[in-house]
Amino acid sequence: TKIDPWFIERMKNIVDYKHKLSEYNTLEEIPAEVLREAKVLGFSDFQIGRFVLKTKDTNMEKEVLAVRAQRKKLNILPAVKRIPTVASEHPDLTNYLYMTYAVEGYDINYYKNEKSVIVLGSGAYRIGSSVEFDWCSVNAINTARKLGYKSIMINYNPETVSTDYDMCDRLYFDELSFERVLDVIDLESPRGVIVSVGGQIPNNLAMKLHRQSVPILGTSPVNIDRAENRGKFSAMLDKLGIDQPKWSALTSMEDVQKFIDEVGYPVLVRPSYVLSGAAMNVCHDDDELRRFLEAASEVSKEYPVVISQFMTETNEIEFDGVAQNGEIVEYGISEHVEYAGVH
């Protein structure tokens, strides 16, 4: 393989421990030292739930929470450490933090009832999106500080301005997962969490956090779900009598074929809760439709895939607005130079 044996041996350690976890069938069976070692090796609650509880569900929310509850019961909690920015040449008292199970203790003090908010960043960049999310994240942090709130940022992309530790009161350079965000919330006890400025990754966490009674600032997670879930959004437009291209939720290939016979090609395949239109495609024939439906179902396993009539050579006009208490306070209208659907 031309891969150094050192790396292969480390990977084998992880695979061996995966097999060890698979020997258990309930979380209560796992000895505390085994569960602790699994966390030290980097296994997430999601992975532990998958290997121990043998669940094939893609969501795993219930299982993740069960592993979390068992961890907390056994007092297996992550430590919070500072990231040194001066190569350990002298004590470094930055607010640049990460979580680990390899050691114990906190490098900082936590105080209850602090006036603070957590902002979830955009995570990994992809071509065509993310810089705007970073701009929004930085503005959210600055606004929170101006309003007298302690600003806490969770993001792991070193290319962003929001991961400059001078920008906020505390920066957690860590993953934007359900598990890790809950870890930070448990420690910080914020007044609220802002998910609306980080793009798709925070949006995907909104409903899960909402179900754990985490206060989400801004747009309600229920309304985020109504916009992100293609089926719910299209059904809402129908209910409100707002014109839209003909559409159908994917239930079976027979229903898809009936829809195609009715509207003809081209059609637009639209998965839900995806980053920057991932797996969203225009199909012009049966072969493309089958191929793109498989791709869309793969990236959007938990949510419906919607097929819409695709209108060619049409203008696309976009409206972005900010509302407060049911009234629009700021908005912008733009017309795309290219035809609708190109971007």
Predicted regions: what they are:
Residues 12, 37-38, 69:
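Alpha-helical transmembrane segments of multi-pass membrane proteins
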Residues 7-10, 60-67:
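Helix-turn-helix DNA-binding helix
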Residues 3-9, 14, 43-44:
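Accessory DNA-binding and partner-docking regions appended to nucleic-acid-acting proteins
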Residues 17-37, 44-55, 62-65, 73-343:
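N-terminal beta-alpha lobe that positions the nucleotide/phosphoryl donor
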